Amino acid sequence: GAFKKVDKTTFYELAEKMIEEQVALNEIRQSTYKRKLETLKMLSSLSDKQLRKITEDDIIAYFKDNLDYAQSTLNKLYQLLGAVFKKAMKKGIISKSPLEDLRVPKSHKKTDKVRALTVEEQARLLDVLNNNDINYSEIMLVSMFTGMRGGEICALNIEDIDFQNNCIIVNKTTSRGGDNSVIVNETKTEAGMRKVLINNDLAAFLKECIGERTGGSLFVSSNNKPVTTQQVNYYFWNTLKQYDIQDKSLQGKLTFHSLRHTFATRCIESGVPPKVLQKILGHKDISVTMNVYCDVFEKFEAAHLNAVDKYMKLNNIVLGKSETKTVKVA
């Protein structure tokens, strides 16, 4: 019979080819491409192995050695492995994925969720940002009062501010390229493209930020380059530390992204319905809004029920026998 040539493609060869194809076909962005290559580097112990020789035991051994990675990193590694093995099956290099019967491993690391600022922390931070010269404080304030993502704020041009209709047009975001340069992309999803309404205070504040300028980026760094969220995060964190803003007794970590959560949390606390919040935040799906803010919604479910209860009692809609009898009409 005919002799079938054995496929000796290594894990690295196929993985790299797959990622290169994705970026060439515009399936992924430059920043995602860069991250995927970083993830691939972490799988170096499997890199030179031929795909057909990688076993489930190899994968288990790899993960056992790396349970100190953050959960998000383990998820990314698992995802990339899965994609490569799926591709290898499609190409007929292997008949079954060694990952098939394995679940995502659980990290040893405690995941510190990014949390919102409390009302007290927010008031303290606001006071500091309003009265001190803090780098990128304008970007922090816009995030605090619109809930926009950091990358969306950094990508704003002056002409994206519509003072006639008091809104900000969101249609792009920044990310980092392979050489650490800042790339401006369209927003990640359709839902990301939106109009964010602003109040008169914020409109006046933005007019101040713009000054005499007529176009170009709304915010730039000291060397006139676009700002990265990493830069803002650095100064945000510094400010919290320097002015002792963070309540250390609370769980969860505070980052620049906390300002988006803070805005959303204040919205829920003041009774904004989930569907409206989804639109403001630019979430593709209501489930994202509900999952990210479920604990805040739950807390306010009780408060809303109390309000309903009060309203009913006020209008004599009460369970149990009443003092006054309703007269039966014959």
Regions found by a protein language model. Name each.
Residues G1-T9, E13-K17, L25, A61, ...:
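Basic/aromatic DNA-contact patch characteristic of tyrosine site-specific recombinases
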Residues D7, E16-I93, T111, K225-Q231, ...:
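N-terminal core-binding DNA-recognition domain of tyrosine site-specific recombinases/integrases
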Residues Q71, D127-Y136, T146, V196, ...:
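Short, basic (Lys/Arg/His-rich) helix/loop patches that form interaction surfaces
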Residues N75, K90, I94-L156, Q164, ...:
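Basic, Lys/Arg- and aromatic-enriched nucleic-acid-binding interface segment
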Residues S107-K109, D133, G151, N165-L197, ...:
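Basic, Lys/Arg-rich DNA-contacting stretches centered on the C-terminal catalytic core
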Residues H108, A116, T174, L281-A307:
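Catalytic-site neighborhood detector that most strongly recognizes the C-terminal catalytic loop/helix
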Residues D160-C167, V272-C294:
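Short, polar N-cap/turn motifs at the start of nucleic acid-interacting alpha helices
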Residues N165, R176-G178, V184-M193, N200-L202, ...:
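C-terminal secondary-structure termini that scaffold catalytic or DNA-interacting sites
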